[in-house]
Amino acid sequence: MSFRKFTATADPEKDETIARKGHFYGVYLLCSQSLDSRYRGKCYVGFTVNPKRRIKQHNRGCDFGGAKKTSRKGPWQMVMIVHGFPNNIVALQFEWAWQQPTLSTRLKIFPELKRKNPRESHFDYNFRILNRMLGVGPWNRLALKIRWLETDYERGFEVPLPRHMEIVSGKVSISSSQRRKGEDAAATVPVAWAPECHLCMQRIDQPERSRLGCTNPTCRLTCHMLCLANYLLGDEPGHYIPVGGECPLCETRLSWSALLQRKRLLNGIPEELLDQEEADEDLSDGPDVDSDVEVLESD
């Protein structure tokens, strides 16, 4: 049996700022540390935009923003979180499927996920569901990070994950600034764009909307977004959005999500968007949404 090795990128004892407020979407797994044997070891799957705040809400109870299903059944530990979703809708769909594998169309092909095995812990059962989810579409084409928050629970994945997914360790912290550390510097580096697409050799009209380049700052790749997408898809018929591939000029390994992020930084964030983010606290800094689904499994 082969397991994928862990890739630790953070000191587990320290917080790591990985996203700015309003741009983090995570689906987490809680495990109860209750002294009551009825609840100890039970698990809960939820969605959050701020993991540190969310675990505090769960442990304080539903009167303080926690979920009704976790009240008085803790204390809880947030042991792992999956993040890197492009938006909250995709993350909430992932959350629902993880909660309800027997109802998910994507997971019905795995009859072994219908119930927990007799001697299997609740954590191991939920981890087994997650392992299968990450290997099937549409989730297997997302640039996701599987982040361990508690080292005592870390283990390998029995079913190998897609190569573009990362397994990392370390706590999560959300930055309140409009940009992550280093983003301002990246956005101010001058780019020597070519007037034509390197792939179709046609002029690029409306470059702010349709132009993409390499993430390697020394590479002069200039392409239409559609041309580069088709190039990276290569021999993947039936797909419209690539996962990644090699730069056609410098052969740097590219991630499609990183290309789009770089494009956003180079174009800048419109002032009206910044104003909306600062004004709409209910969207970016309000209570998290939890699906009203019970996942505290019984033996």
Swiss-Prot record:
Its cofactor is a divalent metal cation. A zinc finger (SLX1-type) spans 197-250. PROSITE patterns: GIY_YIG. Pfam families: GIY-YIG, SLX1_C. Residues 23-109 form the GIY-YIG domain. Catalytic subunit of a heterodimeric structure-specific endonuclease that resolves DNA secondary structures generated during DNA repair and recombination. Has endonuclease activity towards branched DNA substrates, introducing single-strand cuts in duplex DNA close to junctions with ss-DNA. This is Structure-specific endonuclease subunit SLX1 homolog. It is found in: Nucleus. One of its GO terms (cellular component) is Slx1-Slx4 complex. It comes from the Eukaryota. Keywords: DNA damage, DNA recombination, DNA repair, Endonuclease, Hydrolase, Metal-binding, Nuclease, Nucleus, Zinc, Zinc-finger. Its EC number is 3.1.-.-. Belongs to the SLX1 family. Its main location: nucleus. Forms a heterodimer with mus312/SLX4. The gene is slx1. One of its GO terms (biological process) is double-strand break repair via homologous recombination.
